[in-house]
């Protein structure tokens, strides 16, 4: 089964075990009125036959898939929505001064807790242990002060790492910073550390859009102004930086002891790889020009190849011949 969203209002489930891909189910967000628009941006997450996905309408859905096989051995689904959680509240709307509270990232799940973020800067934790009974109470709530497109990153200890944009330039953005570590076990004072990513020339060219990559005691974050940062996860100290070009929206990827990141967005796009033999001091091992356009999507690596979509509308595979 393939699960994906679209800009035509629909989140789809498509079967790949037929002679050709076959749509089995779709949910139209226009039938679930929310607060912004009806796109689906994040990747669905599935835990024990339940799919969790937030939409740009600002609503998080928990959907029981009821997966099974028909008499011919083909997969089938009979989904039912268990819970819908609105990602906004009156306090958030008053604080940000607008109604942009869409969910544009994927969720993070650990030990029965689900975390999601939205464009109003809200970081929300839900207890999903009773979701099949229609319950998903809010157990954590933090306002970061600005738009969050990056997915929350969670470590083995339950700490959250959040990358935040810089668009509204509210006072809260100065208080909180743009790359932060949160401890949900301290709901009244969860901010552990923060790193500021200030604007360069305009009020909106600071912050971070890309989801950080969590390594061995180091968080790697690509920023909108064009810096790649290596941050100590314990202290928040910036250990190392490198220039990767403005508009760095593609999320870095760690694979086989290397960090892979899209670079040079305004110069035709490209990829760069760093050795993480010393996690605190990445060493560039190769740099490849793409030339086809800016890469904003996150690459996938499989069988020695890099697969990624580009802003020029093409899907690419890079690797040795």
What are these regions (language model features)?
Residues 1-41, 45-321:
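Extracytoplasmic/lumenal domain signature
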């Amino acid at each position: 089964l393939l699960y994906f969203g679209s800009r035509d209002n629909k989140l789809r489930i498509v079967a790949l075990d037929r002679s050709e891909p076959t749509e089995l189910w779709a949910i139209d967000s226009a039938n679930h009125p929310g607060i912004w628009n009806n796109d689906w941006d994040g990747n669905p997450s599935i835990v024990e036959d339940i799919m969790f996905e937030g939409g740009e309408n600002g609503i998080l859905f928990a959907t029981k898939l009821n997966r099974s096989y028909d008499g011919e051995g083909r997969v089938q689904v009979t989904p039912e929505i268990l819970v819908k959680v609105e990602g906004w509240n009156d306090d958030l709307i008053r604080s940000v001064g607008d109604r942009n509270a869409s969910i544009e990232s994927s969720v993070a799940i650990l030990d029965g807790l689900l975390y999601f973020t939205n464009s109003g800067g809200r970081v929300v934790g839900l207890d999903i242990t009773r979701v099949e009974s229609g319950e998903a109470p809010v157990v954590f709530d933090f306002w970061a002060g600005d738009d969050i497109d990056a997915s929350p990153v969670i470590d083995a200890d339950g700490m959250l790492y959040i990358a935040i944009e810089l668009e509204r330039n509210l006072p809260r953005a100065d208080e909180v910073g743009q790359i932060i570590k949160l401890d949900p076990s301290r709901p009244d004072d969860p901010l552990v550390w923060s790193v500021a990513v200030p604007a360069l020339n305009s009020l909106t060219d600071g912050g971070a859009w890309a989801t950080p990559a969590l390594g061995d005691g180091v968080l790697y974050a690509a920023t909108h102004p064009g810096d790649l940062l290596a941050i100590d996860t314990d202290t928040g100290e910036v250990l190392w930086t490198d220039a990767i070009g403005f508009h760095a929206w593609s999320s870095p990827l760690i694979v086989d002891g290397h960090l892979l990141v899209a670079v040079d967005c305004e110069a035709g796009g490209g990829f760069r790889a760093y050795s993480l033999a010393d996690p605190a001091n990445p060493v560039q091992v190769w740099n490849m020009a793409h030339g086809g356009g800016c890469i904003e999507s996150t690459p996938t690596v499989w069988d020695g190849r890099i697969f990624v979509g580009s802003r020029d509308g093409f899907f690419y595979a890079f690797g040795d011949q």
